Amino acid sequence: MKKRIIALFLLLTLLLTACKNNNNGGGNPGGNPSGGNGQNSGITGDDSSYGDDLEDLGAMDGYFEGDACDVTVKCISGTPGCYKIEGNVVRFTSVNAESVYSISGKLSGNIIIDTGDAHKFDLELQGFSMVSSVSNPITVLSGDEVSIQAKKDTDNFIYDIRPAISEDDTVSLSGAIHSEIDLEIAGKGSLSVVSSNNNGIHSKKDLQVKNLNLTVSCKDNALKGNDSVELEAAKCTLISTVGDCIKTTRSDISSKGNQRGTVSFIGGSYEVYAACDGIDAAYDVLVDSNATISIYTDKYSNYSEEVTRVSDDTYYIRFNYSDYKYSVKYYNSDDDYLWVNAEYHSTASGGRGNYYYHSFPKNGEYAKMQFFMYSSDMQQGQEKEYIVCSDYITLSDAYDTIALTARGSYIYYDWTNYTTTVNDFGHGGPGGPGGGMNDGNADKGDHSTKGIKSSNNINILSGSVDIKSYDDGIHANSGVTLENGSTSTGNVVISGGSLNVYSNDDGIHADGNLTVNNGSVNIINSYEGLEGTTVNILGGNVSVVARDDGINGMATSGAAITVDGGTLYIYCGGDGIDSNSRTSYGGILFSGGKTLVVSTSGGNSAIDSEAGYSYTGGTVVAVMPRGGMSNEATRCDSFASKGNSTSLSLNKGGYLVCEIGADKLIFNSPVSISALVVTLGDSGASVTTKSSDSHGLSEGEFIWE
């Protein structure tokens, strides 16, 4: 539960008021209109979570208890006699030709593939179940190429029931299937991999999943290829209960000249469930060939467990302002207390700003503590002069971080955990690069829970992608020094297919440029819908529902936002289209397409630019409450010749009808507004309302004629 600390000094109140984001009553714009561009999604617009029991998925059908080594191994082709069964270990050794072996039956033990580097080796699973409680089930040590294949019309099962591998254990392998070399998981049958306490499938090189029906359920990474992960024409259900689901770690160039670190989807169907990031790529993410992907993170995955990392000896204080010092008074009684000064510890990026950590030692000899905030010129460790102080707090064993939040004239605090970047298992760090702290979603933890995250670029060329994430739906980082020597660009490009995002933070965030060339983009729920250094809508159908800004262009010069084609709809509680560019009449460019923007907040504008914007083509309708900042929407270089503004009352469920040149818009309003309607395209535009219409539109739907 959040606690409130009353600010004792007006200085702090004024400072926080000046620095905080001013929504002026924005917030939720009031309902989630369905949008008017015909986009469909399997993602619901509520807090529903997803994921069936493993038993219902059939993943536990092959589990057995007790000791078993009832297996049949056959040489299908290639070098015969290249295996041994020693106790409960099946070992494949050197082959002198490309070879295919099969295995069936039950094994309580392990498989080791160590066939040398000269020839390809395939292991076919033909109705095979194995359970391992001592070491990881399958280890691939060598081979020119190694493929583990689920034979057509067979069901196969691998269970890793070992205890969790300790962070200090440098010998044990965390993956149920672990490979030191490039690994292919393929076939026309089915394979279920269940790792109770560790990773799913891990290749220290390239990992390829092709054709088969694959289910992986594990604690940490379901699929991890240090160099790359490629999924092609497969059907996968991938579950990570405390970590990132699909992950790469390297971003250098291989000896063959190949860029490492990309996660690729080439056709197929994939369900991804993650407690942290759904996809975390060290380089790029690529979606192509009509791949179908559904991603659920954090609380939207039924499999997620709490992700915590509690320090044994340190507490932290976290705040998003740097100019303060802190002290803690440990307390048992008026005669038994101890003052401790907090020291600066670290800074973490929060996307729209930084978060500053101060640390102080835990002291279990005291039952309570009270923390004090001081300005930079105040003395620490005293209670006569300070900015704010808490009440007495009971020491926590479950949490190690006191997170401070400024809201209005108050400071709030809440217990959470300082989660650092975690060993080889791949948990998200403090938000991961590019913003996982409490941005638009004040309830986020300190680990990154994005749908798709890359350290460079994200490209969606075709297919269908549904994301329901507790953090940003899609996030591309820039400014990361990659192992190939370059600096990441952080671009997101959507050139086709269908993208549907429900996010508790940003729908799509590009540290670099966000471009929609074609396809459909439907942001069902978000804090800010589309955000990038530049945002370019060049085609396709784009629909955005946002609690704050619909589109935010962060560039401070040039055209931060360009609309040049397609259909754009925004329904938001902040600024509809918001450019930070200070270029005179250049921060936003409308040059084509059809745009409808609805802002429900009186303190914001449907179109907001620092120094005006430009219009050269297309049709624009901007709806917002009269007064306030609405005059920003008329700061257009062509407004006198191409613009029109009309004041009217728009009722919830009523229809707005705009006739602008050859275009006609009919819009069923999801909210009542004493509106200013700004249009661009024809200075003689007709703007009217009516109570009914023959098109049968639901609230929030529209049609262009």
What are these regions (language model features)?
Residues V193, M373-V388, S692-E699:
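Short acidic/polar inter-strand loop motif in beta-rich domains
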Residues V209, E365-D377, A685-S691:
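A short, solvent-exposed beta-strand micro-motif common in secreted/extracellular proteins
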Residues S304-V310, Y386-G426, V678, S694-E705:
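Extracellular beta-sheet/turn segments enriched in Thr/Pro/Gly and aliphatic residues
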Residues L8-L10, C19-S304, T419-E705:
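A composition-driven surface/loop motif
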Residues K325-K329, Q370, V657:
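Beta-strand signatures of extracellular beta-sandwich domains
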Residues D323-N363, S376-I387:
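Aromatic-rich carbohydrate-binding modules that target alpha-glucans
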Residues M1-T17:
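Sec-dependent bacterial lipoprotein signal peptides
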Residues E305-S333, K642-S645:
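Short, surface-exposed binding/anchoring microloops in extracellular/periplasmic proteins
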